[in-house]
């Protein structure tokens, strides 16, 4: 009976589906099952200034596609990022508040997913390529260090002192997808399209300029990349504020510091102005008040969408080439409304001054730097303590393919290793090399 039921279901499916070369019919509706046809179909539904598909030669290595590949190129990039080890490790990397201190603190992974959701929503509203925006968003923080920005600043300082370049997480993210990750025996990296790689690099400024092929000095050439760059800032500021409120850290800090309390009150006033909440004034100290963050995010997302439409109309943007020409002049088209931008900048300045200066965060940052410093100095003084695969890289840093643009490559191997650690692994590795009583 089970076999008969299976056969019946298969016959029903065959009646619904009709395969014909590059097309499949589902109840009479024809859909492409060929990558080229799928990407060509985007031209009918996306705006003329969107990135329809990658340019020729966008991947460094030629990809071998199945004849009936049913994903577009940017969807493939998205999937490669999701299945990478670096992406999985984001789950155990601190955003601002160390995640093992509370079950609901955001991590690099949750932040990344939130940025991807914002980016897809705005891209859909503007008829941009959602797949490209999502791929950029999912890859934008792959190069982040454990324990948040404190370790990034430490590694940057070490390289700068040694005159060996700089360390910025956006550049490291490109380095992860270009060299550190591996999906083929024939080459290093994930072999992503240049459109995705450029967006990852430019979600923050490329201050070192080591990826010259991606035009580091200009804003992102795609509107999809510009969307990710802006919503990344919106996401982390709003959600870091929310985590601070829900944890009770902000309320406790207000009770101890008058200046801090004044700054938080100013943030509250600005948010009330942004939300135009004349009838009901919200505060930012109690858990019950955190739901206003959703309203704030909605307000900012709508501001971005509406102002970006106005920018596109005002600048008479009709093609992707128009977007690129403005980018070459240093101008972006994805922006907040001017009055909202001014208020948001003030909120950002106050959050950096007050929330990120909370004693608990500063204590966690100090401990993180101590761990990173001990690891760095230990590996510099005795590279043989590196794991075998990292030691192999250390001994073969004359490979120009992997270290192009970097000076004194051995130090960069150590930076790569530390930057790739999760919070948990960094603590375990620190214990392994610093505690004489631990078993090896």
Kindly label every feature range from the protein language model.
Residues 1-5:
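Ser/Thr-rich, low-complexity intrinsically disordered segments
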Residues 145, 158-159, 250, 440:
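A generic membrane alpha-helix/interface feature
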Residues 139, 143-144, 235:
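Short active-site segment of divalent metal-dependent hydrolases/proteases
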Residues 6, 10-112, 116-122, 130, ...:
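Histidine-centered, transition-metal-coordinating active-site segments
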Residues 105, 144-145:
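Short strand->helix junction
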Residues 134-139, 230-231:
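Short alpha-helix carrying the canonical HExxH Zn2+-binding catalytic motif
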Residues 148-161:
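A glycine- and small-aliphatic-rich helix-loop capping segment at beta-alpha/alpha-beta transitions
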């Amino acid at each position: 009976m089970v076999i008969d039921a299976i056969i019946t279901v298969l016959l029903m499916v065959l009646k619904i589906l009709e395969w014909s070369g590059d097309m499949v019919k589902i109840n009479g509706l024809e859909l492409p099952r060929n990558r080229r046809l799928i990407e060509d179909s985007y031209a009918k539904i996306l705006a003329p200034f969107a990135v329809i598909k990658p340019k020729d030669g966008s991947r460094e290595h030629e990809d071998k596609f199945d004849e009936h590949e049913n994903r577009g190129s940017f969807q493939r990039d998205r999937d490669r990022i999701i299945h990478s080890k670096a992406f999985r490790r984001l789950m155990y990397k601190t955003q601002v508040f160390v995640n093992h201190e509370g079950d609901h603190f955001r991590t690099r992974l949750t932040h990344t997913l939130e940025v991807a959701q914002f980016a897809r929503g705005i891209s859909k509203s503007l008829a941009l390529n959602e797949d490209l925006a999502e791929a950029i968003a999912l890859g934008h923080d792959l190069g982040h260090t454990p324990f948040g920005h404190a370790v990034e600043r430490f590694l940057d300082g070490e390289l700068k002192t040694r005159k060996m370049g700089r360390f910025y997480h956006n550049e490291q993210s490109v380095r992860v997808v270009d060299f550190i990750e591996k999906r083929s025996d024939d080459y290093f990296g994930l072999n992503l399209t240049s459109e995705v790689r450029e967006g990852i690099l430019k979600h923050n400024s490329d201050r070192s300029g080591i990826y010259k092929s991606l035009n580091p000095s200009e804003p992102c050439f795609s509107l999809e990349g510009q969307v990710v760059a802006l919503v990344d800032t919106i996401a982390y500021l709003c959600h870091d504020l929310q985590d601070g409120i829900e944890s009770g850290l902000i309320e406790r800090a207000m009770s101890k510091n008058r200046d801090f309390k004044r700054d938080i009150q100013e943030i509250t006033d600005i948010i009330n102005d942004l939300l135009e909440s004349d009838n009901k004034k919200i505060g930012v100290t109690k858990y019950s008040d955190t739901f206003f963050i959703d309203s704030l995010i909605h307000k900012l997302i709508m501001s971005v969408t509406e102002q970006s439409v106005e920018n596109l109309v005002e600048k008479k943007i009709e093609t992707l080439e128009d977007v690129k020409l403005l980018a070459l002049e240093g101008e972006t088209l994805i922006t907040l409304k001017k009055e909202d931008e001014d208020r948001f900048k003030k909120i950002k300045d106050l959050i950096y001054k007050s929330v990120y200066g909370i004693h608990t965060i500063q204590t966690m940052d100090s401990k993180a730097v101590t761990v990173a410093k001990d690891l760095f100095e230990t590996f510099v003084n005795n590279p043989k303590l590196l794991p075998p695969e990292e030691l192999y890289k250390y001994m073969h840093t004359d490979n120009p393919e992997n270290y192009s643009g970097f000076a004194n490559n051995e130090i960069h191997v150590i930076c790569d290793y530390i930057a790739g650690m999760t919070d948990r692994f960094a603590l375990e590795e620190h214990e392994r090399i610093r505690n004489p009583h631990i078993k090896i």
